[in-house]
């Protein structure tokens, strides 16, 4: 099987999913994709021929940072095997978690739209700062995979990353993170809070991408109204 994550973690490369599916079909391989970033609102993997879709309910679908849950979806052929595996392993979730996930689904389009708008506004603002080397946001025109993103996706969610220039030390980045007034510190995303985290991508990634930055600053934007915070920044 071939497992896809699009966009890729940390540097947000967009995978050419159509080509991957062609390879899978030619070689009789199953295709799997993590669709947590885009959700079905902005990308439907089954329309591209993907066999199995994985999403973290914990993130955007829940939207309130109060559920730890995931979902695996498949077509009719694979669904039977997935259901059998779930039954044999006793891998079930509580009715309350399902109820709360349905609650999140009802507001997902509105929340995701606002998160997308805010993240792009902040990404464009950060592009103008000399201290920042790269903004990894596929909705930006200078992103190397922007055209591929436009072809396959209906939108971009609130998660993106920025890279500082090499002369900005990690300690300085940590100080910047600690002094942010709007963003809290956290590695999760997709909830009601605006969070950020710092990391060195070269130390946190098993597979090398075409471009591995020396240091990264991961940010996620909630649907908080930016204008309400302008006097605090």
Predicted regions and their residues:
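Short coil/turn linker and secondary-structure boundary residues
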Residues: 15, 77, 167-171, 226
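Conserved small/polar residues in nucleotide/adenosyl-binding loops
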Residues: 224-231
């Amino acid at each position: 099987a071939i497992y896809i994550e699009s966009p890729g973690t940390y540097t947000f490369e967009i995978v050419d999913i159509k080509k991957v599916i062609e390879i899978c079909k030619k070689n009789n391989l199953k295709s799997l994709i993590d669709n947590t970033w885009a959700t079905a609102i902005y990308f439907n993997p089954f329309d591209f021929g993907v066999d199995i879709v994985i999403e973290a309910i914990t993130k955007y679908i829940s939207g309130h940072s109060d559920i730890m849950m995931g979902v695996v979806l498949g077509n009719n052929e694979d669904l039977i095997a997935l259901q059998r595996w779930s039954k044999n392993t006793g891998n079930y979730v509580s009715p309350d978690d399902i109820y709360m996930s349905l609650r999140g689904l009802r507001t997902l389009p509105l929340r995701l739209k606002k998160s997308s708008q805010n993240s792009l506004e902040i990404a464009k603002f950060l592009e103008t700062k000399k201290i920042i080397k790269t903004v990894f946001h596929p909705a930006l025109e200078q992103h190397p995979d922007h055209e591929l993103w436009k072809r396959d996706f209906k939108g971009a969610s609130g998660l993106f990353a920025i890279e500082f220039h090499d002369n900005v030390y990690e300690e300085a980045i940590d100080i910047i993170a600690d002094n942010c007034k709007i963003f809290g510190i956290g590695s999760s995303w997709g909830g009601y809070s605006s969070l950020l985290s710092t990391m060195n991508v070269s130390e946190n990634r098993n597979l090398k991408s075409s471009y591995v930055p020396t240091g990264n600053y991961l940010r996620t934007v909630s649907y908080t109204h930016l204008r309400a915070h302008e006097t605090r920044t």
